[in-house]
Regions:
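Acetyl-CoA-dependent GNAT
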Residues: 5-8, 14-18, 22-95, 104, ...
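Short acidic/polar active-site loop segments enriched in Thr and Asp
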Residues: 81, 117-118, 141
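Conserved active-site alpha-helix within GNAT-family acetyltransferase domains
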Residues: 101, 126-144
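Conserved GNAT acetyl-CoA-binding A-motif
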Residues: 113-123
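Conserved beta-strand-loop-alpha-helix junction that forms the acyl-donor binding cleft
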Residues: 122-132, 149-155
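Terminal substrate-recognition subdomain of acyl/acetyltransferases
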Residues: 155-170
C-alpha cells in the first residue's frame, strides 16, 4: 500500500500498460460498468489502443512503487470549457483504500492547471453507490438522472450525471 499522505502520483498512461489494465475487465458487465458504450465491439488491446489515440482524450494513471498499475482514468476535452472525467478504475486488489478519490482529485487539479476548463462532468450508474460517494466527497453534485440509459445484464439502468465547478482562484 502507498503512503496515506497526499502526494500526487499522477502520470500519463503508457500504452504498453494496456494489457495490465484490460486484465481488470473480466466480463461484459465489467466492460459496461467501466466504459459504457465506448467499446461497442469486443474490448481488445487493438480497440483500446485506437481509443487512446483520440485527439480529445488525455489518459492518466497511478503506479505502485513496483511499477504496477494502480488506477486509470481519462479526461475528455469538449469544445466547451467543460471536461468529462471518464473510465475511472482502480486495481481490484486495491479498492476501498482512497486511491480513486485521490486520483480524481489529481485529475481535477490537472484540469485546473490547463486553465481551459471551468467545469468537470462525469456519468455513473445510479446504483453505483461507492462511485457516487467517492465523487460527492470531492465536491461533485448530481445534476441529472438519465432513466433507462444503459442495458446491463439484460436490465435497463439509470445513469447519474454529476458535475463540479473548477475554480481558478488560489
Amino acid at each position: 500500500m502507498l503512503k496515506k499522505t497526499y502526494n500526487s502520483l499522477l502520470v500519463r498512461f503508457p500504452k504498453e500498460k494496456s494489457s495490465q489494465l484490460l486484465e481488470w475487465i473480466k466480463t461484459e458487465e465489467d466492460r459496461i460498468i467501466w466504459s459504457g458504450n465506448t467499446f461497442k465491439k469486443k474490448l481488445s488491446i487493438n480497440s483500446f489502443t485506437e481509443h487512446l489515440n483520440r485527439t480529445d482524450l488525455d489518459s492518466f494513471a497511478y503506479f505502485t512503487p513496483g511499477n504496477n498499475l494502480l488506477t486509470y482514468g481519462e479526461v475528455i476535452t469538449n469544445k466547451s470549457p467543460t471536461g468529462s472525467i471518464c473510465r475511472i478504475i482502480v486495481n481490484p486488489m486495491e479498492r476501498s483504500k482512497g486511491y480513486g478519490q485521490n486520483f480524481c482529485k489529481d485529475l481535477l487539479l490537472w484540469m485546473k492547471k490547463k486553465e481551459k476548463f471551468n467545469m468537470a462532468t462525469l456519468n455513473t450508474f445510479a446504483d453505483n453507490q461507492k462511485a457516487i460517494n467517492c465523487y460527492r466527497k470531492i465536491g461533485f453534485k448530481i445534476v441529472a438522472r438519465k432513466p433507462r440509459s444503459r442495458k446491463l445484464g439484460g436490465i435497463w439502468k439509470d445513469m447519474i450525471v454529476m458535475s463540479k465547478a473548477i475554480s481558478h482562484r488560489n
